[in-house]
Regions:
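Membrane-proximal extracytoplasmic
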Residues: 1-357, 365, 375, 396-401
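Small-residue-enriched core segments of transmembrane alpha-helices in multipass membrane transport
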Residues: 113, 362, 373-395, 404-406
Length: 406
């Protein structure tokens, strides 16, 4: 009987005493790979996308569209590898999004795009400023959202607490972009008194220019002494309302005229231009009700990082900061955790695979006998285990696509 290569190979494994050890080892390394392979919600599909911000101060949306957006769309569509270009025109600027074909090199695409823009900048209308490019990838999607809210907390206080927490979270390894959305930023406002300006013979233009010149920090030169060179820096940035009020804006009756003499200066939240609330729906299992001012802190991961591990590290750090940084009247609630959902999907898959293996084994045993059932019971888990090992060795991640492939 001609067994062939496959038959001879199978015969060697059937007769070998190390075959059971290889089977057990395959199951163990597959189980280990399941926990070591990075888990994430979204697959690592390379679809280069770039957002281009083109400032055009003073232009209305219709003018931005006619004079900037349409011409840029036509120009960028001609770049090799570009799949789609679309734009949004708003007051003072245009947002152009360029999407490349799947598999295009992201860095090379950015270089080609920038070169094309610079080559055609002379065709832009007068007043258009230098464009700003920002690459968009799947890793920009936040894997964790933390919402700061409180019954008596103000939006300014919520944002201040969230920003302080965000600064601490940026020190964690493999963390990507950390953003704070909602709330009110700190703003120092200068409210000029026109009567005092007229009385002291000072114009608003003078004050604006003096504020711009004073809010700087630069290198003024160097001092050399005994073979040592000391760098001299002058000026400083404004840090408080007192710093702004102490700016000298002119002379009056031979004495310095300070900004606080002709204006009222406040240090507090900016003017409200958006509202963000946190609340519960009617189906909440604890019966909670109400809506409260809120600020959301979003955390994205770096490419290739494990969303589950990163989310656990962030949550552990936040638990520490609750005691030191977050005020007592502010509650931090987890509103999104892709690391948690990714882990749930992995274990749900393993559970369903186990049920399927047992069901198939029972059916095979009923119709073909226990020998065929035993082969099925052992071969299927080993195959999946080795597949998971291959995922780990080739730097794949466990996500909705790779899990579906299993």
């Amino acid at each position: 009987m001609n067994e062939g290569i496959a038959g001879k190979l199978a015969k060697q494994f059937i007769n070998s005493k190390i075959t059971p050890l290889l089977m057990v080892a395959s199951l163990l390394v597959g189980l280990l790979a399941t926990f070591m392979t990075p888990r994430e919600e979204e697959p690592q599909i390379v679809v280069p996308m770039v957002d281009i911000y083109i400032p055009f101060p003073g232009a209305a949306p219709s003018e931005v569209e006619d004079r900037v957006a349409r011409s840029v769309e036509r120009t960028l569509t001609e770049i090799p590898g570009v799949d789609y270009v679309y734009s949004t025109s708003m007051q003072d600027f245009a947002l152009v999004t360029v999407r490349y074909k799947v598999g295009e090199d992201a860095e090379a695409s950015m270089v080609k795009l920038w070169a094309t823009l610079m080559k055609n900048m002379d065709k832009m209308p007068q007043g258009v400023q230098m464009p700003l490019m920002k690459k968009v990838s799947i890793d920009d999607v936040p894997v964790l959202n933390l919402t700061f809210w409180g019954k008596d907390a103000k939006p300014y206080e919520l944002r201040k607490a969230a920003v302080e927490v965000a600064d601490q979270l940026k020190q964690i390894k493999d963390i990507g972009d950390v953003e704070v959305k909602g709330g009110l930023k700190r703003q120092i406002r200068v409210l000029l008194d026109k009567n005092k300006l007229a009385a002291h013979n000072v114009s608003a233009f003078q004050i604006v220019k003096q504020l711009q010149n004073s809010n700087t920090h630069m290198t003024s030169g160097t001092l050399v002494n005994v073979n040592q060179e000391v760098i001299v820096r002058s000026g400083q940035f404004f840090e408080s309302a007192d710093d702004v009020g102490n700016i000298v804006v002119g002379l009056y009756a031979g004495s310095p005229l300070y900004l606080r003499d002709v204006a009222r200066i406040t240090d507090g939240p900016e003017e409200v231009d958006n509202y963000s609330f946190f609340g519960w729906g009617a189906a909440d299992h604890e019966g909670r009700q109400g809506e409260y001012p809120a600020v959301t802190l979003t955390v994205a991961k770096r490419k290739g990082a494990d969303a589950t591990v990163l989310a656990d590290q962030v949550l552990a750090k936040v638990d520490e900061l609750r005691k030191t940084t977050v005020p007592s009247g502010i509650t931090v609630t987890q509103t999104r955790n892709y690391g948690e959902t990714a882990t749930e999907k992995v274990f749900t898959l393993l559970e369903h695979l186990s049920i399927a293996i047992v069901a198939v084994t029972v059916i095979v045993a009923f119709f073909l006998g226990w020998r065929g059932a035993l082969v099925n019971f052992m071969s299927v888990p080993i195959t999946f285990a080795l597949t998971l090992l291959v995922y780990y060795l080739f730097d794949y991640s466990l996500n909705r696509v790779t899990l579906f492939a299993l």
